[in-house]
Every structure is written in C-alpha cells, then in structure tokens.
A protein has these predicted regions:
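Residues forming the flavin
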Residues: 1-54, 60-166, 170-190, 194-561
Length: 561
C-alpha cells in the first residue's frame, strides 16, 4: 500500500443527485470511500450553463491509501496529479540603509497590504490615513445616510479600510498571480471568512470586511508599524528630484525618503498637489453611468431556473456587456452586489455619487449593479486632471437634480427607455412585495430603506428625475441600447421592476501616476504610486496585490529600518 496526496480537478456534483463530495471524488479516482484519509476543497464554483442540470464544480486535495500499482494508474489520469505545495517566496533585501521610516499614504487595501508586508520584515512603516478610525467612520456614514449631514473628512471614500469598507467585499480579480493565495491567507488570518480561500467568486461582505481591516491594522502594529488616522498629507517636500518629506494637516513636516502613495481614487485634492509638484501623471479612461436595482428573485430565476433558491447555490449574480456597432462604446455591469443596497458615496460637498454594497449574508432581496459606459480622454480632455473635472460635473448635476440635499435622482428602467415621465411606483410595488428581511450588526442599520419597504434603497432618499439630463448623451444612449440587450439575456432586466439611480462616476481612477519598472515615480525618486488611486488596480484584490509588489520593490532596494 502507498499513501498519495493528489490534486484532483473538475469534480462535478449535480444538484439533481443526492451525493457527497467524497463519493464524487471516489468515482473520479475509481476507489472506495474507505481509501480516503482526507479530502480538502481548494476551489468551488457553480456551473449554471445548463439550467436543467446545474452542477457544483470542485478542485480538491485528496490524501488516499491504495495499492502502489493502482496509485501509479490514478496519477496518469486527466485532471489528477501529485500535489506539490507552493512555498511563499522570501523577499530579497537590499543593501541601502534607510535613514527614515517608510510612510504609506492611505489605509485602503493597497496601503494596508503594503504596510503589512513591510512591517513583517522589520521596516516599521508609518501609515497615514486622512479619514477617521473605523468605528467612528461607520457612525459618520450612517448619520449621513440617515440625515444627509455630509462630512468631507469621513465618508464612504475616506477612512480606515478605504472605499472597500462600504462595498460588497468582493475578493475576485482577473490578475493571475501566485501571490493571491498568500494575500487571501493573510485576509483570513485577519478575520475574513475562511471560504474566500476556496470560492470561485469570494466575497466578505462589508460587515466581515470591517473585521478584516481591524485585524490587518492590529497585525501591522504588532510588527512595529504605526497607523495614524485623521492625518492628511497636504504637501510633498521635494529636494533635487526626490521625495524628502511630507507636510501634514497639523503643520508637522515629516522627514522620509520612501513614500507609498496609496491615496485611493477619490483623493482629488492630493491629485492637485501632485500636479503642482510636477509629479508625472496622465489622464486615463474610466467609466460612468447609473446603478440599477431589481428583485433578487428575478436574477436568481434567470440564472438558476428551477434551482433558484437552492440552499447550496446562494443568490445569483450577473456580468453583462454590450458593444455598440462601431465598437467605440460599451455598456457593462460593474461591481454587481447580490442581496445588497445602493449607497451614497460622495466625498465632496455638493456632489452625489452612488455605489453598491452587500453584507456577508446578501439577504436584502434586492440585486444591484452599476451599469456604466466607457469614457476616454477623447471625451473629456488629455490634461491629467481633466477626468476629475468631468466626474465632478456630473456629480454636481446629480446633486442639483436630487434637490441639493444629497438625495439622488432616480427613475424606473421603463421610463428611462421610453423617455416617459419618471415614475417608480410600479417598480416600488413589486420590490416591496419581493424584498427579504435582514438583521442588524455592529450598529449598522442594514439594508436601510430596503427593509423598511421603501424603494429605491439609496439613502438619504431619492427624487424622481429624467436621468438623460444628468449624463452625456453618448452615455445615456449607450445605456439604453445596453439595457434592451441585457433584457434579452436576463428576462425582465429591462422591465417595469427595474430602478435606476445616479450617478456612478468612481468606477476607477481618472488618471495614472506614472511609474517605472522599479515601481517608483518616473519623475520623483522615492515616491511609489500604488493601488487603484494611482491607476494600477481595479478592486480590493488587485489593489492589495499591487501593495504587496510595491512593498517588495522597496525591500529589494533597502535594508530594514
């Protein structure tokens, strides 16, 4: 007999059959269940391409004890191989001594992961976060949502954890990098749900994500790092083309030669300071549009058919794309939040911005997603800050349309398509009847007006308004074409139960801080542009990954502090 540890891929488990995972693995290997010592899931996905036979798809590590001759045959079969563990790569330390501690600007996913990596290896980073600590930030945001009392210093964009703290907590990325597993392990250690290690579409939810942020902060501090909230960088000290220090909002001048710039995509005042300093940057494409809400039951039925509501499936999501005939524009779903709510995400006074958020349980009964259209410097100008001005223009239009009180303009999908008078009553009635119920946690009033039976879910409220007038015509026209196409893909998507709320403008940074192969600014040595705000990521995981690589680039150059 021999003991083998195998990687077994593509194990299909039909929801139509009453079969355990171990039985499915045994069938694939051609062995008895008694031969197993251990089965560990490493990946789980849903295959819903055939609505009449939805399957769960697993990759596992199986430890088995079988005759040697049988083991030799098993490892030659397709999708089966001997398991070889991947060891984390230790960083290569540089020889240059650091004269001052490295500073990380921003405590979002990029900044926190960069700081954690630096702290673990003795670099003692100092993290400067302009917004407030997490518990205070949650109070501020809830007050804004309830009363419209906006605080530019503490909101959905600024504060401990970054913008992702009020999101669905999606931990997916299209970037294929072996470091991703290491980052997910760090997130679980910090408090994220363990299943993010195995789910094809992992998500933590905004509630669990907050636990994770607190855990990451504690670990950074345990290694000798330091985190200072309500500490904004207002200027950069530059000497002979390199960073020499930072000026803080309390007047302090902080000496440092190494700065990780992970400011987030809404730090527009920081962008202006960087431009005044001549730090190399360029305008880049992004997307703007609206948020759409539907009954979650409509999406579940469209994606899962008769299996909708099956306890092993959870709620369904979607990813939709439409290209115009000339291929110049695309309308697409972005940041889809099953069982969530639309949230007020402004970071400047006098502007309305919407975003989506879900809790871990995703149980609001409402599905929402951004529906956005790509825009490029050809639309708004090639000057580096032109995209910021473009975003701000439509945020101010939305603010005025909502009543200048942070209510958002909203309209039913039907009237948006038909250019009819805005009327969301039909959609409200249907949604009110189909909404689920949620439960409170951590002092956060969950799902807000959704659970109160009032729709749309955006707080502090909405004003019915023709959304055509607060978007460029090429955006609204493309959205209408896209909505009709999406209605062919998901029955009812363009029907009377859909509600649109505007505007969604913060899909990604409108500019890029240019860096070289060494991750440093091409114009200012010692400045390391990092994460989504500098144009190098598009979500929690890609931002975290960029923070990791920036930290490793610093280690490659310097000795620990």
């Amino acid at each position: 007999m021999t003991v083998l540890k195998l990687r077994v891929n593509d194990i299909r488990m039909s929801l139509r059959k009453e079969q355990t995972l171990k039985e499915c693995v045994a069938d694939k290997l051609g062995i008895k269940k008694s031969a197993f010592r251990k089965v560990q899931v490493v990946h789980r996905a849903v295959d819903a391409r055939r609505k009449n036979n939805i399957c769960l798809l697993y990759h596992v590590i199986a430890e088995i004890e079988v005759p040697q001759s049988l083991g030799q045959k098993i490892v030659k079969r397709p999708g089966i191989s001997l398991f070889v563990p991947v060891q984390a790569e230790s960083p290569h330390m540089g020889d240059i001594p650091m004269t001052e501690r490295p500073v990380v600007i921003g405590a979002g996913p990029a900044g926190l992961v960069a700081a954690l990596e630096l702290a673990k290896y003795g670099y003692r980073p100092l993290v400067l976060e302009r917004g407030r600590a997490l518990h205070k930030r949650v109070e501020d945001v809830n007050r804004f949502w309830e009363t419209g009392d906006f605080d530019p210093a503490s909101n959905v964009q600024f504060g401990m954890g970054g913008a992702g703290t009020f999101s669905d907590g999606k931990l997916t990325t299209r970037v294929n990098d072996p470091v991703m597993g290491e980052i997910l392990q760090a997130f679980v250690k910090a408090g994220a749900p363990g299943e993010i290690l195995t789910e094809h579409k992992p998500h933590a939810g905004t509630d669990k994500l907050r636990d994770m942020v607190q855990g990451l902060a504690a670990e950074i501090e345990s290694y000798g790092g330091e985190i200072c909230c309500e500490t904004q960088v207002t200027d950069f000290v530059v000497k002979e083309g390199r960073i020499a220090g930072l000026v803080l909002n309390n007047g302090t001048v902080l000496s440092t030669e190494t700065v990780v710039l992970a400011c987030g995509h809404s730090a527009r005042d920081t962008y202006h300071v960087l431009a005044e300093k001549g730090i190399g940057m360029e305008a880049k494409a992004f997307a703007i549009g609206l948020r759409v809400e539907h009954p979650q039951s409509l999406i579940d039925k469209a994606q899962y058919g008769d299996f909708a509501g099956h306890p092993r499936l959870g709620v369904a999501d979607y990813a939709l794309v439409y290209h115009t005939e000339d291929r110049k524009r695309a309308a697409y779903s972005f940041c889809m939040c099953p069982g969530g709510q639309v949230v007020a995400a402004a970071s400047e006074a006098g502007g309305v911005v919407v975003n989506g958020m879900s809790l871990y349980n995703r149980d609001s009964g409402i599905a929402n997603s951004a529906l956005v259209v790509n825009v490029t410097p050809e639309d708004f100008g090639t000057e580096p800050l032109a995209g910021v001005a473009f975003q701000r223009k439509y945020e101010k239009l939305a603010f005025a349309a909502g009543g200048k009180n942070y209510k958002a303009p909203a309209q039913s999908v039907r009237t948006f398509l038909e250019k009819a008078r805005p009327d969301i009553k039909d959609a409200q009635k249907y949604l009110r009847e189909s909404a689920g119920q949620g439960s409170g946690r951590d002092g956060v009033k969950q799902n807000c007006s959704v659970w109160a039976g009032v729709f749309p879910s955006y707080r502090p409220g909405v004003t019915e308004y023709a959304l055509d007038s607060i978007l460029p015509s090429y955006v609204s026209d493309t959205l209408k074409q896209g909505l009709r196409y999406f209605g062919q893909r998901i029955h009812g998507f363009d029907g009377p139960t859909g509600i649109l709320t505007g505007v969604e403008t913060r899909t990604s940074a409108p500019l890029r801080i240019i860096r070289g192969a060494d991750y440093q600014s091409v114009t200012h040595e010692g400045l390391y542009p990092c994460g989504e705000g500098c144009g190098y990521a598009g979500g929690i995981m890609s931002a975290a990954l960029d923070g990791y690589h920036v930290a490793r680039a610093i280690m490659k150059k310097y000795k620990p502090f």
